[in-house]
A protein has these predicted regions:
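N-terminal subdomain of lithium-sensitive/metallo-dependent phosphomonoesterases centered on the IMPase/IPPase/PAP
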Residues: 1-93, 255, 262, 271-276
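Residue-level signal for inorganic ion chemistry
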Residues: 23, 27, 51, 62, ...
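Solvent-exposed alpha-helices and their adjacent loops that cap or buttress functional pockets
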Residues: 39, 80-82, 101, 115, ...
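Residue-level detection of beta-strand-connecting loop/turn positions
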Residues: 116, 144-146, 239
Length: 276
């Protein structure tokens, strides 16, 4: 994979920034004023007029500024030039359930993949007024100030975060065992409800690690590059290279990565023994 030059990366990052900030204004205007909330199929998998209006705004910007790129949008699916190596993965409202309830943990996430690898990302949380940006080889920022991951090295000193997939009512393949075990052996596990918020919280050092299953590329593309450029590490659960379409992700400050991966393997046997 040959990266764009620095000037091109800067332009692409500006595109992502314009997109998330524009959508963020829409989310701010509509919060608390939603006329219609729908379920997309599974219980708890919500979509609102805010999702749709924010996504439309992002799509308009991408179609205008990068018309020859492909787009993968949560609500609209695949759009644009489908044979392009550049794919914009967009989640116009990551944390819809939080947003619908007025809980201030949602964001707009816009990431750019090149040959399946995240190279540019912007995440804007309109409730915190926080803009995270990152580009491959260029570092990451929060409101244009450089950020880095935490220096926590011990799992028992770490604060983690996870999420529960929408299909959790339909499958036994959940992360409940890991949640219980890691709550037992760390300083705590949080459940935020927005993958992009979780990833950026690890990127800026508020949290030390994050894992989840049932994710889509638009949930994590932007957050991955922001976290990696802040010094973090992102892999599959077993530390193998991440395939972004796999839906499973382990993301940490790098220092606890091996131990957290091992703990995920230990969780189910521990839980069975705990309740034996």
């Amino acid at each position: 994979m040959e990266l764009p030059n620095q000037n091109e990366l800067d332009i692409l990052l500006d595109v992502a920034t314009e997109a998330v900030m524009t959508a963020g204004i829409i989310l701010q205007d509509l919060v608390g004023n939603l006329e219609k909330i729908e379920e997309k199929g599974r219980p708890g998998d919500l979509v609102t007029e805010a999702d749709k209006k924010a996504e439309a705004a992002v799509l308009n910007i991408l179609k205008r500024r990068v018309p020859h790129h492909q787009i993968l949008a949560e609500e609209s699916g695949k759009l644009g030039t489908l044979n392009s190596d550049y794919i914009w993965a967009i989640d116009p409202l990551d944390g819809t359930t939080n947003y619908a309830h007025g809980y201030p943990a949602s964001s707009v996430s816009v990431g750019l993949l090149l040959e399946g690898i995240p190279i540019v990302g912007a995440v804007y949380n309109p409730f915190r007024k926080e803009l995270f940006r990152g580009a491959k080889g260029s570092g990451s920022t929060l409101n244009y100030r450089p950020i880095q991951v935490s220096q926590t090295t011990e799992l028992n000193q770490s604060l983690l975060v996870t999420g529960f997939a929408y299909d959790r009512r339909e499958t036994k393949d959940t992360n409940y065992p890991e949640f219980c075990y890691l709550t037992h052996i760390t300083q705590g596990v949080r459940r935020g409800g927005s993958a992009s918020v979780d990833l950026t919280d690890v990127a800026c050092g508020r949290l030390d690690g994050y894992w989840e299953r049932g994710l889509s590329p638009w949930d994590i593309a932007a957050g991955i590059v922001i976290l990696e450029e802040a010094g973090g590490k992102v892999t599959a659960y077993d530390k193998s290279p991440l395939v972004i379409e796999s839906g499973r992700l382990l993301a940490t400050n790098g220092h606890i990565h091996n131990n957290l991966s091992q703990a995920l393997d230990e969780a189910l046997p521990w839980l069975k023994n705990f309740y034996a």
